[in-house]
Amino acid sequence: MAKEKYDRSKPHVNIGTIGHVDHGKTTLTAAITTVLARRLPTSVNQPKDYASIDAAPEERERGITINTAHVEYETETRHYAHIDAPGHADYVKNMITGAAQMDGAILVVASTDGPMPQTREHILLSRQVGVKHLIVFMNKIDLVDDEELLELVEMEIRDLLSEYDFPGDDLPVIQGSALKALEGDSKYEDIIMELMKTADEYIPEPERDTDKPLLLPVEDVFSITGRGTVASGRIDRGTVRVNDEIEIVGIKEETKKAVVTGVEMFRKQLDEGLAGDNVGILLRGVQRDEIERGQVIAKPGSINPHTKFKGEVYILSKDEGGRHTPFFNNYRPQFYFRTTDVTGSIELPAGTEMVMPGDNVTISVELIHPIAVEQGTTFSIREGGRTVGSGIVSEIEA
């Protein structure tokens, strides 16, 4: 019997659970899969227990070891891929490497504790890496007798979210008990269903990669006698068609405009190339020496070259093959963006003397050449070809 075909008719959304250690992120993940399997039995909705989610396999993403559990489930209207990172360090690494791009997240806060240090850090990281839609799940309400206390905790969470520029007064807060729902208490199961209905309604359907403006990182350039210059690479987002006007952005002082005269894949002519395709793009009016690896081909005006930005970075530990010693202000490694290395200097935040292997930190970077970057662009930090860190652009400065 063939496996059931993957159903593309439902919109797909990436979601995750975030919050302080032991506030119930993994229990909630187990509860969502279990309650949906009971209430909406489909081939996708299979119950996952706490132990199987908690024993997340190790993955390596850009040289960094991360434990993450991936589960899937569906509601009447959507298909969800859900990530749960068991450890705090795993969560930070996931966010910073872009290993887990979330369209929205469920912030789990234990009603018995209220917001804790990692609650704050996860909210800040969500803000920095561009997770714009948070839903709050106040967990463990069965352990709190005092209604006023729940109100105070909710106010405290809303204030904290507002402090980090989330719409604290307006975003949804749902009070429940993941453990009670998991144990089959129907009152608490109803609350899990309400949480999923809220996710369906509050987290907007993500824009598909093909609908975004074209971005094609240039990997290779060659010229075809009599036809012109070909740039090849994998289309990161958007689409490219013959006769499109494009810009060549980064590395050089000036952004150059050109027109696409051909799109090829596997030596065949195409009408258009889509996000994910490896293509060769024939460009009219571009000399072989006017385009190079490390630049990007982009929809005009959609992305600009920059030399200064702030980034959230994770520095690999010694065990992950990173540095054995700390680095200090004005450290000058290479920053690897998409297809190329560019040297840059690092300025540490005020009051931070040094950064140890295994730390995460906000840095200001100044590159020696401009590169096409925007908020959310990921990069690696390298020394002599060896990855020593990983980061994501949180703010453009110049």
Curated annotation (Swiss-Prot):
Q: Which UniProt keywords apply?
A: Cytoplasm, Elongation factor, GTP-binding, Hydrolase, Magnesium, Metal-binding, Nucleotide-binding, Protein biosynthesis
Give the source's domain of life in one word. Answer: Bacteria
So what does this thing catalyse?
A: GTP + H2O = GDP + phosphate + H(+)
Instruction: State which Enzyme Commission number(s) the record gives.
Output: 3.6.5.3
Q: Where does GTP bind?
A: 19-26, 84-88, 139-142
How does the annotation summarize its subunit structure? Answer: Monomer.
Report what the protein is called.
Answer: Elongation factor Tu
